[in-house]
Regions:
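Short hydrophobic/aromatic beta-strand micro-patches
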Residues: 73-75
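N-terminal regions immediately upstream of nucleotidyltransferase
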Residues: 1-53, 57-67, 78-90
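Acidic/Ser/Thr-rich, low-complexity mid-to-C-terminal regulatory regions of eukaryotic proteins
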Residues: 131-178
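Conserved catalytic core of two-metal-ion nucleotidyltransferases
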Residues: 4, 8, 24, 37, ...
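Short, well-structured alpha-helical interface segments that form or flank functional binding sites
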Residues: 94, 114-116, 125, 139, ...
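Conserved nucleotidyltransferase catalytic core and NTase-mimicking acidic/glycine-rich helix/loop elements
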Residues: 178-290, 294-296, 309
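Helical (often loop-to-helix) elements that flank the catalytic cores of nucleotide-handling enzymes
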Residues: 82-93, 133-147, 221-232
């Protein structure tokens, strides 16, 4: 029984893994952007790689193929905040526009835009979201960042990507990497089934789930059950809230994703039954309905069964 589970999920996770050229491409773009902004905001200093931080899925190691947007914070000096905060009107928008104009000098042929919390540079292979940020180094907020939000007339918000990263790493250490693996697989579900739920919310829910899942210390042999059990778990959070690590702001989950989650759970139930019965092809068909073509159909098992039947 369950003869195909390990092979199925090892292959699936391999398909989701970014390739080295993709990682190098992302890192190269982030560094070019950082160098452009560094020369603007630190004109008398040699470039310092610690002036920017990759955040989001790339920063936390949960990025998957196909490539997604790269999010980065660029650390802006506090004297810039003093200057911007003294302006009238939407101060946050003016900061983003200043960053945009700076990047246009380096990337004149790129249609760079600024809105919300980020300046967006849509390169051919990656969209890079650049968030100018002011870093707190002392006091209660040490380690956190203040970022601009241009919506509703503009305001300053707080972000703590280090706390998010550390929390995920702690869960991974306690579960042999299951949190990161599950997040990557669920991103494939989100993309394939067009699920209306924020990736950050999925990451938070995965961390909560994995810390209490009874099989968290087991191997990849249990990943079919992990998928099934997570979809059952998340149904308890319909219209609930999640809160990113390190900040007090909460994110409303809503219920737009409920129907697709129930469908995924039903398909996972079938897939688990097929896995137990060693029907690798039927199981892979159900998994593919959830995750898309990156979960390959198990033609090997199908051909072997046909050969046995012959």
């Amino acid at each position: 029984m369950w003869a195909h589970v390990v092979r199925h999920f090892e292959q699936f996770l391999g398909e989701l893994e970014l390739k080295d050229p993709e990682r190098l491409d992302a890192e190269g773009k982030a560094e070019r952007i950082a160098k452009s902004l560094f020369s603007k905001y630190y004109p008398n200093l040699a470039f310092n790689p610690s002036s920017y931080v990759k955040v989001g899925s790339y920063g936390k190691g949960t990025a998957t193929r196909p490539r997604t947007d790269l999010d980065m914070l660029f650390i802006v000096p506090w004297d810039v905040y003093t200057r911007i905060d003294a302006l009238t009107g939407n101060k946050q928008s003016q900061l983003l526009q200043e960053v945009r104009r700076t990047l246009l000098v380096t990337f004149p042929n790129t249609e760079i835009s600024a809105d919300g919390q980020a300046v967006v540079a849509p390169f051919q292979t990656y969209n890079v979201d650049i968030v100018p940020a002011f870093r707190f180094t002392t006091g209660e907020l040490a380690g956190q960042y203040m970022i601009a939000d241009t919506t509703d007339g503009g305001r300053w918000r707080f972000s703590n990507p280090v706390a998010e990263y550390n929390w995920l790493r702690q869960v991974d250490v306690a579960s042999a990497g299951k949190a990161t693996h599950l997040i990557k697989m669920l991103k494939a579900w989100k993309r394939e089934c067009n699920v209306d739920i924020k990736s950050i919310s999925l990451e938070i829910l995965v961390s909560v789930f994995v810390t209490q899942w009874e099989y968290r210390h087991q191997t990849i042999f249990y990943y079919d059950w992990m998928i099934r059990d997570f979809f059952a778990f998340i149904m308890n959070y319909v219209n609930g809230w999640t809160r990113p690590a390190g900040i007090t702001e909460q994110i409303l989950l809503g219920n737009c994703w409920e129907s697709k989650c129930r469908t995924a759970y039903d398909r996972a139930l079938k897939a688990c039954d097929y896995e137990q019965a060693d029907d690798g092809f039927a199981a892979s068909c159900e998994w593919q309905k959830i995750f898309g073509s990156q979960f390959h159909l198990d033609w090997i098992h199908s051909l072997l069964m046909a050969r046995v039947g012959a």
